[in-house]
Amino acid sequence: MNKVNFRILGLQKYQDIYYIMQKFITCLKKNNINEIWLLEHYPVFTQGNSDNFNKKYIFNIPVVKTDRGGHMTFHGPGQKIIYFLLNIKNLNIKISKLIFYLENIIISTLSYFKINSYSIKNSPGVYVDKKKICSIGLRIKDGYSLHGLALNVDMDLYPFSHIHPCGDKNIKMTQIRDLISNINLEKLNTQIINNCKKFLMMNNFEINFLNSIKIF
């Protein structure tokens, strides 16, 4: 039976999670497990493999080079990060279809909160009223997906003004807090998890919920 671990990890340093993610693939291959991590990051700018930015800091916020696709973005407290470490070969999911599923996980989640959102062809992510509310960046390694998506919930959007988010100088960012008056974070997590199971067809998987992580 296919297995998936949902890990609710709270606020984490990006560099630590990035390191664990790289090492985790070997563990997953040995145990035939899929992982979905829900967390937040301390303030950090991350570069995709399409960027050539050479500074180590922007206004005292660290800049970290990564191996994911896409351009520079910002992560900080109040932004829901969801990492997908999935055996896409076993699941028979192509990268284009995975992006489609991730977009629809967020679109469906936002719909629960009466927020109308949509995707744009050739511009991965989710948008509300021509502003971006969710960014997506992935990498495929040894048949597994790495990285995932970032959903702006209730955060400081100002650092985005120092960069061209996702490589587009015309993109404006938005967040759930600016669209509805009350955000129930427990319901948000529940909707995200339920939609992950739905769109990634995991309802018949063996599912575990964990709140810690280690390399085994």
Curated annotation (Swiss-Prot):
Entry-linked InterPro entries: aa-tRNA-synth_II/BPL/LPL, BPL_LPL_catalytic, Octanoyltransferase, Octanoyltransferase_CS
Cross-referenced Gene3D superfamilies: Bira Bifunctional Protein, Domain 2
Remaining remarks: In the reaction, the free carboxyl group of octanoic acid is attached via an amide linkage to the epsilon-amino group of a specific lysine residue of lipoyl domains of lipoate-dependent enzymes.
CDD domains according to UniProt: LipB
HAMAP family, alphabetized: LipB
Sorted UniProt keywords: Acyltransferase, Cytoplasm, Transferase
NCBIfam families cross-referenced by the UniProt entry: lipB
Catalytic activity annotation: octanoyl-[ACP] + L-lysyl-[protein] = N(6)-octanoyl-L-lysyl-[protein] + holo-[ACP] + H(+)
Function in brief: Catalyzes the transfer of endogenously produced octanoic acid from octanoyl-acyl-carrier-protein onto the lipoyl domains of lipoate-dependent enzymes. Lipoyl-ACP can also act as a substrate although octanoyl-ACP is likely to be the physiological substrate.
Main location (coarse class): cytoplasm
Pathway(s): Protein modification; protein lipoylation via endogenous pathway; protein N(6)-(lipoyl)lysine from octanoyl-[acyl-carrier-protein]: step 1/2
Gene Ontology process terms (BP): protein modification process
UniProt lineage: Bacteria, Pseudomonadati, Pseudomonadota, Gammaproteobacteria, Enterobacterales
Domain BPL/LPL catalytic: 30-204
The keyword Nucleus is annotated on this UniProt entry: no
Site (Lowers pKa of active site Cys): K132
Gene from which the chain derives: lipB
EC number: 2.3.1.181
Family of the protein in this entry: Belongs to the LipB family.
Record localization: Cytoplasm
MF-aspect GO terms: lipoyl(octanoyl) transferase activity
Protein name per its UniProtKB record: Octanoyltransferase
Positions contributing to substrate binding: R68, G69, G70, H71, M72, T73, F74, H75, S135, I136, G137, G148, L149, A150
Active site as annotated: C166
